[in-house]
């Protein structure tokens, strides 16, 4: 396949390289393949931007992975629970540190605290669900969504490139999928649980947040070969 048009512009779609139907691929792979579009031209991406995007993807992947591990530890009462919880909360510190060079210590620490609350409430919610404590489940779910609203408002205020509505929709989807993941695990519906986690992997917020930071501080990420 020739990826160049007659006028020399680059117009290549990744999806064209993979045999259809796309239903044969897992959800994370489908997400990457099908979201690709034809671009009239290519864009130079600096190593700084590439590394920053990769770092954020890794940290949000750790976010959903360690959340899954703590759900497993709570549901099946595994002895590794305190160790898993400690490692999970490190993710909040790491995500805060991602903001530190751009927004300073106060904003970075505040963001880390909001993410920590998000993770702690999630663990408390799953614990209550396992015990069948409906009252606590309802209270913690309300608190969880209030925390999500606080995170969305916080990020949209510090970065004008983050749409509050889009961010809220994505974060609420993240909460809903995580809740479904816990429910299917508690019910020991393991295939459904795996299917939900596949969807969770496609919904991580890393690219949305990291791309907005790149746009806001573009001088720090600008490709040296751009004209």
Model-inferred region functions:
Residues 42-45, 70-81, 96-107:
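Helix-loop segments that flank and shape redox-cofactor active sites
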Residues 67-70, 77-84, 107-117, 122:
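Early exported N-terminus immediately downstream of N-terminal targeting peptides
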Residues 87-109, 113-115:
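A glycine-rich, hydrophobic loop/mini-helix early in the fold
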Residues 111, 116-119, 125-144:
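All-alpha RGS (Regulator of G-protein Signaling) helical domain and cognate RGS-like helical scaffolds
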Residues 96-103, 107, 122-130, 152-155:
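Membrane-helix exit/interface motif
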Residues 8, 19-26, 49-55, 59-74, ...:
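C-terminal amphipathic alpha-helix
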Residues 1-39, 227:
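Acidic/polar low-complexity scaffolding segments in large eukaryotic proteins
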């Amino acid at each position: 396949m020739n990826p160049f048009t007659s006028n020399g512009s680059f117009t290549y779609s990744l999806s064209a390289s993979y045999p259809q139907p796309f239903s044969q691929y897992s959800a994370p792979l489908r997400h990457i393949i099908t979201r690709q579009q034809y671009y009239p031209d290519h864009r130079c991406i600096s190593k700084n931007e590439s590394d920053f995007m990769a770092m954020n993807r890794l940290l949000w992947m750790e976010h959903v992975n360690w959340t899954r591990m703590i759900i497993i530890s709570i549901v099946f009462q595994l002895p590794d629970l305190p160790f898993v919880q400690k490692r999970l909360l490190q993710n909040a510190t790491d995500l805060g540190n991602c903001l530190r060079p751009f927004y300073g210590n106060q904003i970075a620490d505040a963001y880390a605290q909001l993410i920590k609350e998000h993770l702690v409430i999630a663990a408390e919610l799953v614990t209550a669900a396992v015990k069948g404590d409906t009252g606590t489940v309802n209270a913690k779910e309300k608190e969880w969504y209030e925390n999500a609203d606080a995170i969305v408002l916080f990020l949209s205020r510090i970065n004008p490139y983050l749409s509050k509505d889009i961010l809220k929709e994505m974060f609420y989807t993240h909460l809903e999928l995580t809740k479904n993941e816990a429910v299917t695990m508690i019910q020991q519906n393991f295939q459904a649980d795996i299917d939900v986690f596949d969807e969770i992997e496609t919904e991580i917020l890393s690219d949305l947040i990291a791309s907005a930071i790149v746009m806001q501080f573009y001088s720090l990420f600008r490709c040296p070969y751009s004209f």
